Amino acid sequence: MLDFIGQANKKYNFEEKFAALLSNTTHSVSREIKEGFVSAPKGCYIQLEKIATKYVLDNISTSYDRTSGLVVRAASFTEDTGLPLTLGNFLDYYHLDPRAIYSKKLCFARLCVCARVVDDFAEPLEETLTKAFARFAVVDSRRWIRFLLDLLPKLDDTNFSQLSPIEQRMLQMFYVTIWGKAAEDWNSEEVLDNLYALSDSSVLLGELQTLLQYRYDHIDFIDEPVDVGFDCPLDLHCTYTRDQLLVALDFPKPATVREGVKWLPEKQLDVFFVTLNKADKDYSPTTMYNDYSINENLFHWQSQSTTAENSATGQRYIHHREKGSRVLLFVREFKTDSRFGGAAAYTYLGTVNYVRHEGSRPMNITWKLDRPIPARFLKKTNKLIVG
Protein backbone atom coordinates (compact mmCIF):
# COMPACT_ATOMS: atom_id res chain seq x y z
CA MET A 1 0.00 0.00 0.00
CA LEU A 2 1.27 3.46 -0.86
CA ASP A 3 0.35 6.52 1.18
CA PHE A 4 1.45 10.02 0.23
CA ILE A 5 2.29 12.32 3.11
CA GLY A 6 2.53 16.05 2.53
CA GLN A 7 2.24 19.13 4.68
CA ALA A 8 -0.68 17.92 6.77
CA ASN A 9 -2.79 20.00 9.10
CA LYS A 10 -0.72 20.60 12.24
CA LYS A 11 -3.50 19.06 14.33
CA TYR A 12 -3.64 15.85 12.30
CA ASN A 13 -2.83 12.97 14.62
CA PHE A 14 -0.11 10.92 12.93
CA GLU A 15 0.85 9.35 16.25
CA GLU A 16 -2.58 7.76 16.67
CA LYS A 17 -2.46 6.28 13.16
CA PHE A 18 0.92 4.63 13.62
CA ALA A 19 0.22 3.59 17.22
CA ALA A 20 -2.72 1.50 15.95
CA LEU A 21 -0.22 -0.55 13.92
CA LEU A 22 2.22 -0.94 16.79
CA SER A 23 0.13 -2.29 19.65
CA ASN A 24 2.89 -4.74 20.57
CA THR A 25 5.52 -2.11 21.36
CA THR A 26 6.47 -0.49 24.64
CA HIS A 27 8.38 2.25 22.85
CA SER A 28 7.11 5.62 21.71
CA VAL A 29 5.91 6.01 18.13
CA SER A 30 8.73 8.49 17.53
CA ARG A 31 11.31 5.91 18.54
CA GLU A 32 9.68 3.25 16.36
CA ILE A 33 9.84 5.58 13.36
CA LYS A 34 13.49 6.42 13.99
CA GLU A 35 14.41 2.74 14.39
CA GLY A 36 12.50 1.56 11.32
CA PHE A 37 9.31 0.19 12.92
CA VAL A 38 11.01 -2.82 14.50
CA SER A 39 7.78 -3.68 16.36
CA ALA A 40 5.56 -3.86 13.28
CA PRO A 41 3.37 -7.00 13.23
CA LYS A 42 4.94 -10.15 11.82
CA GLY A 43 4.88 -10.05 8.01
CA CYS A 44 4.38 -6.28 7.88
CA TYR A 45 6.90 -3.69 6.74
CA ILE A 46 6.56 0.07 7.07
CA GLN A 47 8.87 2.43 5.21
CA LEU A 48 8.77 6.21 5.21
CA GLU A 49 10.73 8.37 2.81
CA LYS A 50 13.12 10.86 4.39
CA ILE A 51 10.89 13.91 3.90
CA ALA A 52 7.76 12.04 5.03
CA THR A 53 9.64 10.88 8.13
CA LYS A 54 10.50 14.48 8.97
CA TYR A 55 6.88 15.60 8.53
CA VAL A 56 5.58 12.84 10.78
CA LEU A 57 8.22 13.28 13.50
CA ASP A 58 7.70 17.05 13.52
CA ASN A 59 3.94 16.53 13.81
CA ILE A 60 4.30 14.14 16.75
CA SER A 61 6.88 16.31 18.48
CA THR A 62 4.78 19.45 18.33
CA SER A 63 1.57 17.58 19.19
CA TYR A 64 2.25 15.29 22.13
CA ASP A 65 5.94 14.78 22.78
CA ARG A 66 6.26 18.33 24.05
CA THR A 67 4.25 20.15 26.68
CA SER A 68 3.70 23.01 24.25
CA GLY A 69 1.78 20.71 21.89
CA LEU A 70 -0.56 19.61 24.68
CA VAL A 71 -1.10 23.23 25.70
CA VAL A 72 -2.08 24.21 22.14
CA ARG A 73 -4.60 21.37 21.98
CA ALA A 74 -6.07 22.23 25.37
CA ALA A 75 -6.42 25.89 24.37
CA SER A 76 -8.57 25.08 21.33
CA PHE A 77 -10.14 21.84 22.54
CA THR A 78 -13.74 23.00 22.93
CA GLU A 79 -13.62 24.98 19.69
CA ASP A 80 -12.15 22.04 17.78
CA THR A 81 -14.34 19.30 19.26
CA GLY A 82 -17.50 20.88 20.62
CA LEU A 83 -16.82 19.07 23.90
CA PRO A 84 -16.17 20.55 27.35
CA LEU A 85 -12.49 20.44 28.29
CA THR A 86 -12.22 17.69 30.89
CA LEU A 87 -9.44 15.22 31.57
CA GLY A 88 -11.51 12.31 30.30
CA ASN A 89 -12.65 14.10 27.14
CA PHE A 90 -9.11 15.25 26.38
CA LEU A 91 -7.62 11.78 26.81
CA ASP A 92 -10.36 10.00 24.87
CA TYR A 93 -10.54 12.47 21.97
CA TYR A 94 -6.80 12.40 21.35
CA HIS A 95 -6.44 8.71 22.30
CA LEU A 96 -3.85 9.53 24.94
CA ASP A 97 -2.57 7.50 27.83
CA PRO A 98 -2.81 9.65 31.00
CA ARG A 99 0.96 9.29 31.34
CA ALA A 100 1.38 11.35 28.16
CA ILE A 101 0.50 14.30 30.41
CA TYR A 102 1.79 13.21 33.80
CA SER A 103 5.19 11.99 32.58
CA LYS A 104 5.95 15.63 31.80
CA LYS A 105 5.69 16.52 35.51
CA LEU A 106 2.51 18.40 34.68
CA CYS A 107 -0.99 17.98 36.01
CA PHE A 108 -4.04 18.51 33.81
CA ALA A 109 -5.20 21.47 35.88
CA ARG A 110 -1.85 23.22 35.34
CA LEU A 111 -2.01 22.35 31.64
CA CYS A 112 -5.35 24.15 31.45
CA VAL A 113 -3.88 27.17 33.22
CA CYS A 114 -1.02 27.25 30.71
CA ALA A 115 -3.62 27.09 27.93
CA ARG A 116 -5.42 30.06 29.55
CA VAL A 117 -8.75 28.29 29.70
CA VAL A 118 -9.01 28.28 33.52
CA ASP A 119 -7.85 30.63 36.25
CA ASP A 120 -4.52 30.11 37.97
CA PHE A 121 -4.42 28.42 41.36
CA ALA A 122 -1.92 27.83 44.17
CA GLU A 123 -2.09 24.70 46.31
CA PRO A 124 0.38 23.31 48.86
CA LEU A 125 0.57 19.79 47.44
CA GLU A 126 0.69 20.57 43.71
CA GLU A 127 4.28 19.42 43.23
CA THR A 128 3.86 16.33 45.42
CA LEU A 129 0.62 15.18 43.82
CA THR A 130 1.75 15.95 40.28
CA LYS A 131 4.71 13.59 40.75
CA ALA A 132 2.37 10.90 42.08
CA PHE A 133 -0.19 11.17 39.26
CA ALA A 134 2.00 9.15 36.86
CA ARG A 135 1.90 6.26 39.36
CA PHE A 136 -1.86 6.53 39.83
CA ALA A 137 -2.24 6.59 36.04
CA VAL A 138 -1.61 2.82 35.86
CA VAL A 139 -3.81 1.76 38.80
CA ASP A 140 -6.31 -0.85 37.63
CA SER A 141 -7.64 -2.54 40.77
CA ARG A 142 -11.37 -1.99 41.02
CA ARG A 143 -11.36 -2.70 44.75
CA TRP A 144 -8.60 -0.20 45.53
CA ILE A 145 -10.08 2.50 43.30
CA ARG A 146 -13.54 2.12 44.86
CA PHE A 147 -11.99 2.46 48.32
CA LEU A 148 -10.12 5.64 47.35
CA LEU A 149 -13.11 7.23 45.62
CA ASP A 150 -15.13 6.63 48.77
CA LEU A 151 -12.41 7.89 51.14
CA LEU A 152 -11.00 10.96 49.39
CA PRO A 153 -14.11 13.20 49.63
CA LYS A 154 -14.28 12.70 53.42
CA LEU A 155 -10.63 12.79 54.51
CA ASP A 156 -11.26 15.43 57.17
CA ASP A 157 -13.95 13.30 58.80
CA THR A 158 -12.10 9.98 58.80
CA ASN A 159 -10.40 8.38 61.79
CA PHE A 160 -7.71 6.48 59.94
CA SER A 161 -6.74 4.33 62.93
CA GLN A 162 -10.33 3.02 63.06
CA LEU A 163 -10.29 1.67 59.52
CA SER A 164 -10.38 -2.10 59.09
CA PRO A 165 -7.05 -3.91 58.51
CA ILE A 166 -7.63 -4.26 54.78
CA GLU A 167 -8.68 -0.61 54.51
CA GLN A 168 -5.51 0.45 56.33
CA ARG A 169 -3.47 -1.61 53.88
CA MET A 170 -5.16 0.15 50.96
CA LEU A 171 -4.53 3.48 52.66
CA GLN A 172 -0.86 2.52 53.06
CA MET A 173 -0.72 1.81 49.33
CA PHE A 174 -2.14 5.27 48.71
CA TYR A 175 0.21 6.92 51.20
CA VAL A 176 3.37 5.32 49.82
CA THR A 177 2.33 6.25 46.27
CA ILE A 178 2.28 9.93 47.19
CA TRP A 179 4.91 10.32 49.91
CA GLY A 180 7.28 7.47 49.03
CA LYS A 181 7.23 5.82 52.46
CA ALA A 182 4.76 3.96 54.63
CA ALA A 183 2.90 5.61 57.48
CA GLU A 184 4.25 4.22 60.76
CA ASP A 185 1.39 5.52 62.90
CA TRP A 186 -1.98 6.75 61.63
CA ASN A 187 -2.18 9.12 64.61
CA SER A 188 1.24 10.72 64.12
CA GLU A 189 1.31 14.45 63.45
CA GLU A 190 3.26 14.08 60.21
CA VAL A 191 0.90 11.49 58.74
CA LEU A 192 -2.23 13.39 59.71
CA ASP A 193 -0.81 16.67 58.40
CA ASN A 194 -0.04 15.03 55.06
CA LEU A 195 -3.46 13.43 54.68
CA TYR A 196 -5.43 16.45 55.83
CA ALA A 197 -3.37 18.69 53.53
CA LEU A 198 -4.97 16.90 50.62
CA SER A 199 -8.22 18.66 51.43
CA ASP A 200 -6.37 21.99 51.19
CA SER A 201 -5.42 21.12 47.61
CA SER A 202 -8.96 20.86 46.29
CA VAL A 203 -8.08 21.31 42.62
CA LEU A 204 -5.46 18.56 42.65
CA LEU A 205 -7.56 16.30 44.88
CA GLY A 206 -10.43 16.69 42.44
CA GLU A 207 -8.13 15.80 39.56
CA LEU A 208 -6.94 12.71 41.39
CA GLN A 209 -10.53 11.55 41.85
CA THR A 210 -11.23 12.23 38.17
CA LEU A 211 -8.15 10.25 37.15
CA LEU A 212 -9.11 7.31 39.36
CA GLN A 213 -12.65 7.27 37.97
CA TYR A 214 -11.23 7.41 34.45
CA ARG A 215 -8.98 4.45 35.19
CA TYR A 216 -11.90 2.54 36.73
CA ASP A 217 -14.08 3.14 33.66
CA HIS A 218 -11.35 1.84 31.35
CA ILE A 219 -10.51 -1.43 33.14
CA ASP A 220 -11.02 -4.18 30.56
CA PHE A 221 -10.36 -7.39 32.49
CA ILE A 222 -11.80 -9.26 35.45
CA ASP A 223 -9.78 -9.08 38.65
CA GLU A 224 -10.34 -11.16 41.76
CA PRO A 225 -8.93 -11.52 45.29
CA VAL A 226 -6.08 -13.96 45.91
CA ASP A 227 -5.92 -16.14 49.02
CA VAL A 228 -2.57 -15.41 50.70
CA GLY A 229 -3.56 -16.31 54.26
CA PHE A 230 -4.76 -12.90 55.42
CA ASP A 231 -7.02 -10.06 54.28
CA CYS A 232 -4.86 -8.70 51.45
CA PRO A 233 -5.98 -5.97 49.02
CA LEU A 234 -3.88 -7.16 46.07
CA ASP A 235 -6.04 -8.48 43.23
CA LEU A 236 -5.17 -10.95 40.49
CA HIS A 237 -3.81 -9.52 37.21
CA CYS A 238 -3.80 -5.95 38.54
CA THR A 239 -0.84 -3.60 38.23
CA TYR A 240 1.16 -2.41 41.23
CA THR A 241 4.44 -0.67 41.91
CA ARG A 242 6.94 -2.48 44.10
CA ASP A 243 6.24 -0.10 46.99
CA GLN A 244 2.47 -0.49 46.71
CA LEU A 245 2.49 -4.26 46.75
CA LEU A 246 5.01 -4.55 49.59
CA VAL A 247 3.11 -2.26 51.96
CA ALA A 248 -0.07 -4.16 51.04
CA LEU A 249 1.77 -7.24 52.36
CA ASP A 250 2.56 -5.38 55.60
CA PHE A 251 6.23 -4.81 54.78
CA PRO A 252 6.78 -1.19 55.94
CA LYS A 253 10.15 -0.42 54.33
CA PRO A 254 9.81 -1.26 50.63
CA ALA A 255 12.75 0.94 49.62
CA THR A 256 15.11 -1.53 51.32
CA VAL A 257 14.19 -4.32 48.89
CA ARG A 258 16.76 -4.40 46.09
CA GLU A 259 16.65 -8.04 45.02
CA GLY A 260 14.08 -9.84 42.93
CA VAL A 261 12.93 -11.96 45.87
CA LYS A 262 11.64 -11.15 49.35
CA TRP A 263 10.82 -13.63 52.12
CA LEU A 264 8.21 -12.36 54.58
CA PRO A 265 8.45 -14.79 57.53
CA GLU A 266 5.57 -13.28 59.51
CA LYS A 267 3.25 -13.85 56.57
CA GLN A 268 4.98 -17.04 55.36
CA LEU A 269 5.22 -15.56 51.88
CA ASP A 270 7.92 -15.68 49.24
CA VAL A 271 7.46 -12.72 46.91
CA PHE A 272 9.06 -12.88 43.45
CA PHE A 273 9.65 -9.73 41.40
CA VAL A 274 10.34 -10.83 37.83
CA THR A 275 11.62 -8.60 35.03
CA LEU A 276 11.34 -10.60 31.81
CA ASN A 277 13.55 -8.56 29.49
CA LYS A 278 16.75 -7.57 31.23
CA ALA A 279 19.16 -5.00 29.79
CA ASP A 280 22.87 -5.59 30.32
CA LYS A 281 23.34 -2.11 31.75
CA ASP A 282 20.75 -2.74 34.48
CA TYR A 283 21.80 -6.22 35.59
CA SER A 284 25.07 -7.96 36.42
CA PRO A 285 25.92 -11.41 35.00
CA THR A 286 24.81 -12.96 38.31
CA THR A 287 21.36 -11.33 38.15
CA MET A 288 20.48 -11.98 34.48
CA TYR A 289 17.93 -14.60 35.52
CA ASN A 290 16.19 -16.61 32.81
CA ASP A 291 12.48 -16.19 33.58
CA TYR A 292 9.57 -16.86 31.23
CA SER A 293 6.21 -18.59 30.97
CA ILE A 294 6.22 -22.05 29.40
CA ASN A 295 2.50 -21.89 28.73
CA GLU A 296 -0.54 -20.33 30.39
CA ASN A 297 -0.16 -22.57 33.45
CA LEU A 298 3.59 -23.06 33.93
CA PHE A 299 6.34 -20.53 34.60
CA HIS A 300 10.11 -21.08 34.44
CA TRP A 301 11.95 -19.12 37.12
CA GLN A 302 15.63 -18.94 37.97
CA SER A 303 16.63 -18.37 41.59
CA GLN A 304 19.39 -16.09 42.78
CA SER A 305 22.82 -17.38 41.78
CA THR A 306 23.71 -18.15 45.41
CA THR A 307 20.64 -20.30 46.13
CA ALA A 308 21.53 -23.98 46.45
CA GLU A 309 18.88 -26.70 46.32
CA ASN A 310 19.91 -28.00 49.77
CA SER A 311 19.90 -24.54 51.40
CA ALA A 312 17.10 -23.42 53.71
CA THR A 313 15.77 -21.14 50.98
CA GLY A 314 15.98 -23.82 48.29
CA GLN A 315 14.22 -26.35 50.51
CA ARG A 316 11.52 -23.80 51.31
CA TYR A 317 10.89 -23.30 47.59
CA ILE A 318 10.69 -27.06 46.98
CA HIS A 319 8.57 -27.94 50.04
CA HIS A 320 6.56 -24.74 50.49
CA ARG A 321 3.22 -26.56 50.59
CA GLU A 322 4.33 -28.95 53.32
CA LYS A 323 5.90 -26.08 55.26
CA GLY A 324 2.76 -23.95 54.96
CA SER A 325 4.20 -21.05 52.99
CA ARG A 326 2.99 -19.47 49.76
CA VAL A 327 4.79 -18.07 46.72
CA LEU A 328 3.52 -14.90 44.99
CA LEU A 329 4.53 -13.99 41.44
CA PHE A 330 4.75 -10.40 40.18
CA VAL A 331 5.95 -9.86 36.61
CA ARG A 332 6.89 -6.91 34.42
CA GLU A 333 8.24 -6.86 30.89
CA PHE A 334 10.97 -4.24 31.35
CA LYS A 335 12.64 -2.52 34.30
CA THR A 336 11.80 0.97 33.03
CA ASP A 337 8.92 2.35 31.03
CA SER A 338 10.57 3.29 27.75
CA ARG A 339 7.58 5.33 26.56
CA PHE A 340 6.94 7.47 29.60
CA GLY A 341 9.97 6.99 31.83
CA GLY A 342 10.23 5.82 35.42
CA ALA A 343 10.21 2.35 36.91
CA ALA A 344 7.74 -0.04 35.32
CA ALA A 345 5.01 -1.52 37.51
CA TYR A 346 4.35 -5.24 38.03
CA THR A 347 1.39 -7.41 37.03
CA TYR A 348 0.22 -9.75 39.79
CA LEU A 349 0.00 -13.31 38.44
CA GLY A 350 -1.09 -14.73 41.79
CA THR A 351 0.14 -17.74 43.75
CA VAL A 352 2.28 -20.51 42.26
CA ASN A 353 3.19 -24.05 43.32
CA TYR A 354 6.43 -25.97 42.91
CA VAL A 355 6.49 -28.58 40.13
CA ARG A 356 10.14 -29.49 39.58
CA HIS A 357 13.62 -28.02 39.42
CA GLU A 358 16.98 -28.51 37.80
CA GLY A 359 20.41 -27.44 38.96
CA SER A 360 21.67 -25.53 41.97
CA ARG A 361 23.24 -22.09 42.37
CA PRO A 362 21.03 -21.10 40.61
CA MET A 363 18.00 -23.36 40.75
CA ASN A 364 15.83 -23.52 37.63
CA ILE A 365 12.33 -24.03 39.00
CA THR A 366 9.10 -24.71 37.14
CA TRP A 367 6.07 -23.30 38.95
CA LYS A 368 2.40 -24.01 38.29
CA LEU A 369 0.14 -20.99 38.52
CA ASP A 370 -3.07 -21.36 40.48
CA ARG A 371 -4.77 -19.16 37.89
CA PRO A 372 -3.75 -19.26 34.20
CA ILE A 373 -1.98 -16.33 32.59
CA PRO A 374 -4.49 -14.36 30.46
CA ALA A 375 -3.89 -14.42 26.71
CA ARG A 376 -3.13 -10.70 26.63
CA PHE A 377 -0.13 -11.25 28.93
CA LEU A 378 1.02 -14.58 27.53
CA LYS A 379 2.77 -13.17 24.47
CA LYS A 380 4.85 -10.91 26.72
CA THR A 381 5.74 -13.58 29.26
CA ASN A 382 6.46 -16.43 26.84
CA LYS A 383 9.78 -16.05 25.02
CA LEU A 384 8.96 -19.06 22.85
CA ILE A 385 6.19 -17.21 21.00
CA VAL A 386 7.42 -15.38 17.91
CA GLY A 387 5.75 -12.38 16.27
Residue ranges and their predicted role:
Residues 168-271, 277-278:
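Charge-dense, extended regions
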Residues 11-158:
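Long, largely alpha-helical accessory region at the distal end of helicase-like NTP-driven motors
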Residues 338-387:
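Compact mixed alphabeta submodule
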